Amino acid sequence: MQRELNRFLHYLEVEKGYSQGTIKAYQIDIERGLIPFLNQRGKFGVEEVIRGDIRAYLGYLTVERGNSSVTRARKLAAIKSFFNYLVENEELEANPAASIKSPRIPEKEPVYLTEKECVRLLETMIHKAKPQVKERDMAIAVLLLHTGLRVSELTNLKLSNVDLKRGQIKITRKGNKEQYLHLNGEAVKALSSYLHSRPQAQNGKFFVGTKGQNLSRTYVYEVVRRYLRLAGINKDKHGPHLLRHIFCTRLHQKGVAAFVIKELAGHKSLNTTMRYIKIENKEQTEALNRLEFGI
């Protein structure tokens, strides 16, 4: 089964153009989760797997592992993709997971920062950041707030793809798709300040450590969490994705159309964008009031 998985992962990289982070997630879900479970049931070949095995695995994830519906849905999606690949590659006649419905995921109220909390976060960084990382950490926060970049897009941003004179950056989205993003005045100012203090580095990345090394995703998460904590901002979600969320929310609050937000955020589907946007009761009322005939 490992050989089939290796070919599948190669397919995701070469033909689908998935990021290394996404490919790694698929690998972990199947290699460390599904395959050991199947082996314990005496199943060692992909042709031996039946629908009951997949159902049993989902039950195991629920009862034994305590996985949430979100986690189980993600793992099932990875399993379906794996077996779909084998069917399309004529290595299997049918996908044993095809008819299994994804666990129902309860909708949650969106978590986002208010305008005042955004200001408080930035002011906290100005007053409490260490001098050697202050300009860089400020640039990271401002760029996340003003462009809504994913962490991987930020850490992979190349120095050569930052054009402060034109006020734009070129980033690589999911699926290795390139996109140019405009920078507003605050973002240009923050990136310029950081550029003046940026250490020499050979890796070509825009954001680097104090010794010129690559910045990890984990480090960026820790940076955002630290300053949120110092600012006294407590949210259920407290990582960089919270800043991506407020980017979409603020655009919506400023009257930007959903399809424009979709393009700026790099979402594949408008449904994804709508999950970031909280439609207030006041907005619903105002929208319906516009339908009155005035009689």
Give residue spans per PLM region.
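Conserved catalytic core of the tyrosine transesterase superfamily
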Residues: 1-295
